[in-house]
């Protein structure tokens, strides 16, 4: 989003989590960056990988991120936690802190194969640290409808998981413009607003927001019935 030298930032997610681990007082909003496209960001860098080693021996190690986010989340409509494609302590912290999960899966063989392991991890998190964790759905990304590999992978995902996990109608296509975005410091909407991939992300956002409104209505009806 335009902050190119993340290593020079005085405050990152690493500092926030480290303060929670040491039970130090902190201003939870210090260091949160505000982007011109109306998004706030808690930045991260490679130091987070080093902190992951410390989390292994921390007290309540799976709940460190949850404890930090509890201090800021009421100021936002949505908090998105963008996880690395790994199942380490940082990802376990994210799953423990989250209300629900959206699983992006590249329409390729190896990423799709990792679904079973991820679902097993989510099941363990539900059992031990976050019983209310829900899976909102699977988002298919880097979809190249011209290749047989992409078509067969999408079909396999729908066949193996579609009966128990929602697969979003919207798919994110392969696009050169999407690959260029991170180097430009802009979102796809600002960089190429009329592209196929920006339209796909907009359609996906509408799906997610519609789901959220439906959940709110169901919750309200359940509360009214009590």
How would you name each of these model-derived features?
Residues 1-226:
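P-loop NTP-binding core
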């Amino acid at each position: 989003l335009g902050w190119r030298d993340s290593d020079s930032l005085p405050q990152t997610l690493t500092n926030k989590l480290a303060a929670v681990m040491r039970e130090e007082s902190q201003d939870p909003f210090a260091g949160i960056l505000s982007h011109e496209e109306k998004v706030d960001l808690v930045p991260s860098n490679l130091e987070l990988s080093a902190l992951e080693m410390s989390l292994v021996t921390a007290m309540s190690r799976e709940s460190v991120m949850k404890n930090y986010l509890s201090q800021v989340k009421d100021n936002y409509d949505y908090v998105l936690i963008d996880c690395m494609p790994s199942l380490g302590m940082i990802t376990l912290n994210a799953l423990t802190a989250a209300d629900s999960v959206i699983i992006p899966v590249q329409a390729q063989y190896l990423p799709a194969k990792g679904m079973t392991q991820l679902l097993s991890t989510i099941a363990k998190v539900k059992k031990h640290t976050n019983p209310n964790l829900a899976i909102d759905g699977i988002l298919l990304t880097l979809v190249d409808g011209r290749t047989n590999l992409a078509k067969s992978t999408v079909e396999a995902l729908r066949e193996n998981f579609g009966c128990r996990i929602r697969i979003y109608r919207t798919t994110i296509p392969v696009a050169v413009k999407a690959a260029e975005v991170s180097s430009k410091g802009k979102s796809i909407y600002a960089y190429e607003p009329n592209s196929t991939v920006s339209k796909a992300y907009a359609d996906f956002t509408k799906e997610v927001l519609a789901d959220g409104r439906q959940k709110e209505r169901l919750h309200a009806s359940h509360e009214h019935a009590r």
